[in-house]
Amino acid sequence: IASVVFKAGVKDYRLTYYTPEYETKDTDILAAFRVTPQPGVPAEEAGAAVAAESSTGTWTTVWTDGLTNLDRYKGRCYHIEAXVGEENQYIAYVAYPLDLFEEGSVTNMFTSIVGNVFGFKALRALRLEDLRIPTAYSKTFQGPPHGIQVERDKLNKYGRPLLGCTIKPKLGLSAKNYGRAVYECLRGGLDFTKDDENVNSQPFMRWRDRFVFCAEAIYKAQAETGEIKGHYLNATAGTCEEMMKRAAFARELGVPIVMHDYLTGGFTANTTLAHYCRDNGLLLHIHRAMHAVIDRQKNHGMHFRVLAKALRMSGGDHIHAGTVVGKLEGEREMTLGFVDLLRDDYIEKDRSRGIFFTQDWVSMPGVLPVASGGIHVWHMPALTEIFGDDSVLQFGGGTLGHPWGNAPGAVANRVALEACVQARNEGRDLAREGNEIIREACNWSPGLAAACEVWKEI
C-alpha cells in the first residue's frame, strides 16, 4: 500500500504546480516573474519550478508531504505568456496563498517569494516584475509613518513640489562646515537638505556632531525665512539599537525628519524605524542605495516597482525614484508607473507602464517620490510637468555648483520652481514652453540667470 501512497524520487514540478485552470482568490499574493529557462526546459516546467521553490516544494518527494494539505499551501503557476519581443523569455504568473506569509513582515514576504528560487538550475535567469498585494495582507502593515497629506500639513507647504539638496562633497566635511552648507541652502529657499546615503558616523564627522550643527542650521534658517525647514538626518547605522538611538536624538532636537537607507539597512530595521517615526512625529526619508544591484538587469533580479511597493508597506514618507531626466535616466512610462504605485490609492493594471496587476492600497498613506541625480534649473519645467505637485525635487550639484555659492544656488532653484508652477497654473504648456519660462524668470533673478549660464549646455 505504501508504494501507492508514497512514490519516492524526483518528479516534474508541472504535475503539481502548473495549474492553468486555477481561479485566483482576492486573498492571494500574485507575482509576475520574467522567466528565462535553460535550453530544453519547457516554459510550463520552469514556471511551475518557480511556484514550487518559492512556496512548499522541494526537489524530491518527502514523507512529510502527507502530513500537510498541499493544495491549501502550495504556490501555483496559473498563467504563462511569451514575453513580447524577447526570445526564450516568458512571463509566469504565480499565486501564493496568504497563509504562507507572516503578517506585517516584508522580510518574510521576500524571503518566501525571492529567497531561494533565483539560483535555480533549470532557469538561466529570473526577474520578479510585479506583485499584487491583497487587501487582507496590506492591512497588516502600518505603511508610511505619515503620508503625503500629513507631511504637507506639518510643513505648511501646498500646491507645489518640495525642493531638496544633497550636501556635497558627501564625505570629508567637518560637522561645523556641513551645518554651514545646510544653513545656506535652507536660507536661500530650499525646503530640505539631505545627508548623503553614505554619511553615517565616520571619523571625520561623528553623527552626534552633525545632528547638532544641522539642527542649529534648521532653526536659524526657519527664524529668518518664516518657513518650516528640514534636513534628512541619516539614522542608518550598523545595528538597529544604534539606529534607534540616533532617531531618538533627532526627536530630542525637535527636527522634523530623519532618513534611512532601506535596502542596505534591511526591511526589518526599516519597519522598526518607521513605527518609531509614526509614534514620535518624525517624517522618514528613504534612500534606495543598492537598488541597482537588484533591479538593473532586464532579465534577472527584481524590478524597482516591487522594491517600491515593499517600501510603502514597510514605511517611508519619501523615496528616491529616478528622474526621467538628468544623470540617472529612467524610462518615462515605467517610472511614472511606480511613482503612481507609491502615491495613489488605487492603480489600474496597465502593461504599457509595467503595471501587471491592479493594486488597491485601501487608504494606506502615500509616499512622495524624490527626483534626484544630475538635475539642474533647466530641467525644472520637465520635472514639474512629469512629477506634478506631490514630489520632492533634489538638486545637489545643481544647488552647490552655483558660481556665486550655495545660497544663490538655492535661490535659483526656488525661483525656477515658482516660475514653473505659476506658468502651469496660468495654463501654459511646460513641455513646450519650458525654456522660455525659465528665460523669462532670469530677467528678475540674477541668481537664476547665473545658474542658467553655467548649465546651459548640459
UniProtKB/Swiss-Prot annotation:
InterPro entries (alphabetical): RuBisCO, RuBisCo_large_chain_AS, RuBisCO_lsu_C, RuBisCO_lsu_C_sf, RuBisCO_lsu_fd_N, RuBisCO_lsu_N_sf, RuBisCO_lsuI
Positions carrying N6,N6,N6-trimethyllysine: K7
Listed GO CC annotations: chloroplast
Active-site residues from the entry: K168, H287
Family to which this protein belongs: Belongs to the RuBisCO large chain family. Type I subfamily.
GO biological process: photorespiration; reductive pentose-phosphate cycle
Subcellular location, record wording: Plastid, Chloroplast
Binding of Mg(2+), residues: K194, D196, E197
Misc. remarks from the entry: The basic functional RuBisCO is composed of a large chain homodimer in a 'head-to-tail' conformation. In form I RuBisCO this homodimer is arranged in a barrel-like tetramer with the small subunits forming a tetrameric 'cap' on each end of the 'barrel'.
Species this protein is from: Gladiolus gueinzii (Coastal gladiolus)
Catalytic reaction annotation: 2 (2R)-3-phosphoglycerate + 2 H(+) = D-ribulose 1,5-bisphosphate + CO2 + H2O; D-ribulose 1,5-bisphosphate + O2 = 2-phosphoglycolate + (2R)-3-phosphoglycerate + 2 H(+)
Keyword Iron assigned: no
Modified positions (N6-carboxylysine) in chain numbering: K194
Organism domain of life: Eukaryota
Primary gene name: rbcL
Entry GO MF terms: magnesium ion binding; monooxygenase activity; ribulose-bisphosphate carboxylase activity
PTM entry text: The disulfide bond which can form in the large chain dimeric partners within the hexadecamer appears to be associated with oxidative stress and protein turnover.
Matching HAMAP family: RuBisCO_L_type1
Site (Transition state stabilizer): K327
Bilayer-spanning residue ranges: none
One Pfam family recorded for the sequence: RuBisCO_large
Keywords from the named record: Calvin cycle, Carbon dioxide fixation, Chloroplast, Disulfide bond, Lyase, Magnesium, Metal-binding, Methylation, Monooxygenase, Oxidoreductase, Photorespiration, Photosynthesis, Plastid
Main localization category: plastid
Protein name as it appears in the record: Ribulose bisphosphate carboxylase large chain
Residues that hold substrate according to the record: N116, T166, K170, R288, H320, S372
Subunit record text: Heterohexadecamer of 8 large chains and 8 small chains; disulfide-linked. The disulfide link is formed within the large subunit homodimers.
